[in-house]
């Protein structure tokens, strides 16, 4: 397991479109998950201990953000051949076990992870209502959550915090 940090936020970078299969067996595009006040895209997986340690907080934050008009979604881009715990079937179980209140999508070609330049799980991308990147940091160091506070700021002002601490987690497991 390689500990990887996210790069500094590239403020204003536009969200890239995608069309991925959800654990609800529906195709989901960027337009489908666009929130009135912002959009949170999270790259996660089932096996990473960093994700497992915060998954309840991710679900709680997504519920909180929904009340602010921010929609969240999670994308799993890992190589499932070498990491079978991240298989689509296990994604379905993982999302049910943790009561996901947001779509959980599989990026089996890893094209979306590459387009977003995702590097680890978890990797958070917080966009304003114009789908401009405003947050690329960690969920928290202590309470209240930095992710929740950043997304609330984005929802109310359209801008993310200037100071951001990188998220850390397992590297994306790339196909060979």
Predicted segment positions?
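Chalcogenol-based redox active-site neighborhoods
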Residues: 1-164, 174-176
């Amino acid at each position: 397991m390689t500990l990887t940090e996210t790069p500094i936020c590239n403020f204003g970078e536009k969200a890239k479109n995608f069309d991925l299969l959800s654990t609800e067996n529906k195709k989901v595009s960027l337009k489908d998950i666009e929130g009135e006040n912002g959009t949170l895209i999270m790259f996660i997986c089932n096996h990473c201990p960093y994700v497992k340690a915060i998954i309840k907080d991710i679900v709680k934050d997504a519920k909180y953000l929904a009340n602010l008009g921010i929609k969240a979604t999670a994308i799993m881009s890992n190589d499932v051949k070498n990491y079978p715990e991240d298989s689509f079937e296990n994604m379905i179980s993982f999302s049910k076990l943790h009561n996901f209140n947001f779509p959980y999508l599989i990026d089996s070609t890893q094209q979306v992870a590459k387009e977003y330049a995702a590097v680890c799980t978890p990797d958070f991308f917080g966009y304003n209502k114009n789908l401009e990147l405003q947050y690329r940091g960690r969920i928290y160091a202590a309470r209240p959550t930095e992710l929740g506070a950043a997304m609330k700021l984005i929802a109310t002002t359209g801008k993310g915090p200037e100071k951001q601490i990188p998220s850390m987690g397992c590297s994306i497991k790339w196909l060979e």
